[in-house]
């Protein structure tokens, strides 16, 4: 439970920093700083190794490089949770997994209904299916102990399943032309990671070097480079036979949490959330992509997560999180519509970082996420007050009964 509390603490604090980074990006893009901001994002950085080198603008180093670190952390969390955490027990994963399925299907259907006549726009169908765990937990942190820990764990587990679905979606639907040569290099790296794991190698540097080479190979192969982070994480040992109490996976996960929560995600938000509001009019806001995205996040997510979860509980496939009620569960479902960084990331893959929709697509992500966050916060705060009032009323009734019994005696 200590690991879960630490995770929640990091993600919640990081969520607040994400909000600050988002506001900063919006201010930069919509003030006299806009030219400087855009030139800064286009600044090229080159890393060379002899005759080999990589030269990319800052925004791509962030989206392909830093986000690979984020997905590496997601991979570590997935492995740990499956082997000894919340995902180990089928009964514990049932409700979040079913809720995540609803949160994937319904938003995608809503987006499809709005964009089915435009094949290019339809490519962004996965944009409203994502949940930003850092932002969502950041909002939850504002409510403090009024939200049961069981609900926070439910949201965290649902978001992890959500991230797993995002990984599969990126691999299947957002991969460009493939390079057989680079895929072969990546395969050799995979074999090397497997060998390091089986031989019980304890050097983090060895895994880092092989992982870095694999990242470059995957980047050059046509498969999105972030997937290298996930795959590499699966080969990090969770324990060693001769030192069962030592875990390389947990050690790396612990070291990375702070860097990702307070560095990677805020930087990603700052370079991707710079939405220009100058060219966005009513026509753009009411365009199929914008409506499909905003309604997919705000309506689709809450309807999908709550309806699937509600049916799972009613048909006894899963149980309501301990100490919670259906209003609180609905509040969490609404909060799942905070797609923000993950939605922006999928948006950049779907539309190749173009401004084809005059920033209306990104603005829709921002609006859908903000409205979902605000509505979820209000619902959870309201349900917490009601629950406190009911508990107080029950205490008064119990005290009254006890007093009557004492008088009779």
From Swiss-Prot:
GO terms for molecular function: sodium:proton antiporter activity. It catalyses: Na(+)(in) + 2 H(+)(out) = Na(+)(out) + 2 H(+)(in). InterPro entries: Na/H_antiporter_dom_sf, NhaA. GO terms for biological process: regulation of pH. Keywords: Antiport, Cell inner membrane, Cell membrane, Ion transport, Membrane, Sodium, Sodium transport, Transmembrane, Transmembrane helix, Transport. The chain crosses the membrane at residues 13-33, 58-78, 93-113, 120-140, 153-173, 176-196, 216-236, 256-276, 279-299, 326-346, 363-383. It is found in: Cell inner membrane. It is a multi-pass membrane protein. GO terms for cellular component: plasma membrane. It holds the Pfam family Na_H_antiport_1. Belongs to the NhaA Na(+)/H(+) (TC 2.A.33) antiporter family. NCBIfam families: NhaA, PRK09560.1, PRK09561.1. Na(+)/H(+) antiporter that extrudes sodium in exchange for external protons. HAMAP family: NhaA. This is Na(+)/H(+) antiporter NhaA. It comes from Campylobacter concisus (strain 13826). The lineage of its organism: Bacteria, Pseudomonadati, Campylobacterota, Epsilonproteobacteria, Campylobacterales. The gene is nhaA.
């Amino acid at each position: 439970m200590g690991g879960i509390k630490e995770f929640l603490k990091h993600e919640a604090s990081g969520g607040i920093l994400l909000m600050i980074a988002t506001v900063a990006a919006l201010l930069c893009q919509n003030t006299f700083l806009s030219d400087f901001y855009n030139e800064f994002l286009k600044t090229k950085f080159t890393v060379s190794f002899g005759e080999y080198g990589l030269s990319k603008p800052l925004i791509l180093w962030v989206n392909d490089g830093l986000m690979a670190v984020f997905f590496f952390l997601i991979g570590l969390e997935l492995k740990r949770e499956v082997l000894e955490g919340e995902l180990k027990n089928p009964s514990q994963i049932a409700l979040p997994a079913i809720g995540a399925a609803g949160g994937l299907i319904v938003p995608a259907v809503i987006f499809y209904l709005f964009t089915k006549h435009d094949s290019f726009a339809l490519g962004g169908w996965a944009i409203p299916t994502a949940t930003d765990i850092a932002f969502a937990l950041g909002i939850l942190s504002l409510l403090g102990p009024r939200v049961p820990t069981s609900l926070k764990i439910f949201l965290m587990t649902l978001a992890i399943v959500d991230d797993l679905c995002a990984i599969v979606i990126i691999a299947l639907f957002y991969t460009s032309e493939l390079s057989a040569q680079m895929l072969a290099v990546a395969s050799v790296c995979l074999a090397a990671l497997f060998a390091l794991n089986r031989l019980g190698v304890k050097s983090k540097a060895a895994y880092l070097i092989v992982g870095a080479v694999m990242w470059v190979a995957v980047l050059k192969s046509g498969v999105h480079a972030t997937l290298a982070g996930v795959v590499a994480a699966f080969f990090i040992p969770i324990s060693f036979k001769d030192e069962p109490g030592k875990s390389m996976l947990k050690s790396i996960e612990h070291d990375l949490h702070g860097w990702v929560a307070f560095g990677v995600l805020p930087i990603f938000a700052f370079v991707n959330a710079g939405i220009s509001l100058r060219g966005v009019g009513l026509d753009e806001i009411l365009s199929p992509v914008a409506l499909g995205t905003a309604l997919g996040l705000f309506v689709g997510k809450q309807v999908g997560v709550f309806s699937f979860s509600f049916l799972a509980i009613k048909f006894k496939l899963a149980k309501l999180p301990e100490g919670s009620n259906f209003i609180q569960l609905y509040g969490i479902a609404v909060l799942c519509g905070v797609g923000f960084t993950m939605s922006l990331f999928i948006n950049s893959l779907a539309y190749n970082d173009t401004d084809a929709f005059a920033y209306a697509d990104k603005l829709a992500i921002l609006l859908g996420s903000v409205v979902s966050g605000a509505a979820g916060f209000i619902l959870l705060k309201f349900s917490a007050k009601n629950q406190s009032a009911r508990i107080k009323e029950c205490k008064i009734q119990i005290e009254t009964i006890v007093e009557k019994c004492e008088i009779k005696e």
